[in-house]
From Swiss-Prot:
It comes from Candida albicans (strain SC5314 / ATCC MYA-2876). Belongs to the eukaryotic ribosomal protein eL21 family. GO terms for biological process: translation. Component of the large ribosomal subunit. Mature ribosomes consist of a small (40S) and a large (60S) subunit. The 40S subunit contains about 32 different proteins and 1 molecule of RNA (18S). The 60S subunit contains 45 different proteins and 3 molecules of RNA (25S, 5.8S and 5S). GO terms for molecular function: structural constituent of ribosome. The gene is RPL21A. This is Large ribosomal subunit protein eL21. It holds the Pfam family Ribosomal_L21e. GO terms for cellular component: cytosolic large ribosomal subunit. InterPro entries: Ribosomal_eL21, Ribosomal_eL21_CS, Ribosomal_eL21_sf, Translation_prot_SH3-like_sf. Gene3D superfamilies: 6.10.250.3260, Ribosomal protein L21. The keyword Plastid does not apply. It is found in: Cytoplasm.
Length: 160
């Protein structure tokens, strides 16, 4: 007998609420402002069935293209075969949240602007590119009271 593959099949854990987060939804969810062009994460809320996305879109990130009274339209790029297809999904605000994916970039832009302002006031140049972590500096370890130990592998034995 074949198994049924309904709209919400296989979502027993994906759509469940977080630990100690059951019950009424906080009002802050409804008071968030979404604007066209915002980057949002889709996270389906299992306690609200209206405007819930298909399980494929759970955990995906998209861009808001439409805002209505109680829902937002989100554009997501879906991989189909060997290409991307732009999908437009309409979701209620309970199932989306602002993405933090650009937060580091926006913070860096602000800090770079502050560094530029400060450098211009002091009349000096500033290097704003990020640098990879450099190797640690050399150290000298004393062997006084710290005798070096020779390490050797333990012979492999089979215990049956």
């Amino acid at each position: 007998m074949g198994k049924s593959r309904g709209y919400r099949s296989g979502t027993r854990y994906a759509f469940q609420r977080d630990f100690k987060k059951h019950g009424a939804i906080p009002l802050s969810t409804y008071l968030k402002v979404y604007k066209v062009g915002d980057i949002v994460d889709i996270k389906a809320n299992g306690s609200i069935q209206k405007g819930m996305p298909h399980k494929y879109y759970h955990g995906k990130t998209g861009i808001v293209y439409n805002v209505t009274k109680s829902s937002v339209g989100v554009i997501i790029n879906k991989v189909v075969g060997n290409r991307y297809i732009e999908k437009r999904v309409n979701l209620r605000v309970e199932h989306v949240k602002h993405s933090a994916c650009r937060q580091e970039f926006l913070n860096r832009v602000k800090s770079n602007a502050a560094k530029k302002r400060e450098a211009k006031a002091n009349g000096e140049t500033v290097y704003l590119k990020r640098q990879a972590a450099k190797p640690r500096g050399s150290r000298i370890i004393s062997t006084e009271g710290n005798i070096p130990q020779t390490l050797a592998p333990v012979a492999y034995e089979t215990f049956i």
